[in-house]
Amino acid sequence: MAKKGAGATRGISPVRPTRALPIGAYLKVADNSGAKVIQIIGVVGYKGTRRRLAAAGVGDMVVATVKKGRPDMRHQVVRAVVVRQRKEYRRLDGMRVKFEDNAAAIVTPEGVPRGTEIRGAIAREAAERWVRLGSIASIVL
């Protein structure tokens, strides 16, 4: 069994937020990487049931295409981490959390952010799982 805190930089979180963003969902981009809107085309590490669309939640890494943004960013396939979702989820202390939009931050395949700042709040679950995102975020809720 894994120790608490093991893998804090990538991947392990004691909270499993509701996966509310299926393939095809559009997300706002919360950082200054040059993309404005992305569409999910895959979820990294998702193991699901046959014929079921993969879905992502807060803290999950997704594969997405850039739909709106700078001309050099458009139509690129990128990796991103979901930092906000509208569907509420429950934390271990009983608090329910939801945000006003669905948003993600563009990262490299290793999890290093491509932008230098994140606009708006990001979820604590995403900041704990992806420490580099938490360090450039303006607010962590």
UniProtKB/Swiss-Prot annotation:
Part of the 50S ribosomal subunit. Forms a cluster with proteins L3 and L24e, part of which may contact the 16S rRNA in 2 intersubunit bridges. Keywords: Ribonucleoprotein, Ribosomal protein, RNA-binding, rRNA-binding. Binds to 23S rRNA. Forms part of two intersubunit bridges in the 70S ribosome. It holds the Pfam family Ribosomal_L14. GO terms for molecular function: large ribosomal subunit rRNA binding; structural constituent of ribosome. One of its GO terms (cellular component) is cytosolic large ribosomal subunit. The keyword Metal-binding does not apply. InterPro entries: Ribosomal_uL14 (IPR000218), Ribosomal_uL14_arc (IPR019971), Ribosomal_uL14_sf (IPR036853). Coiled coil: none annotated. GO terms for biological process: translation. This is Large ribosomal subunit protein uL14. Disulfide bonds: none annotated. The keyword Ribonucleoprotein applies. Belongs to the universal ribosomal protein uL14 family.
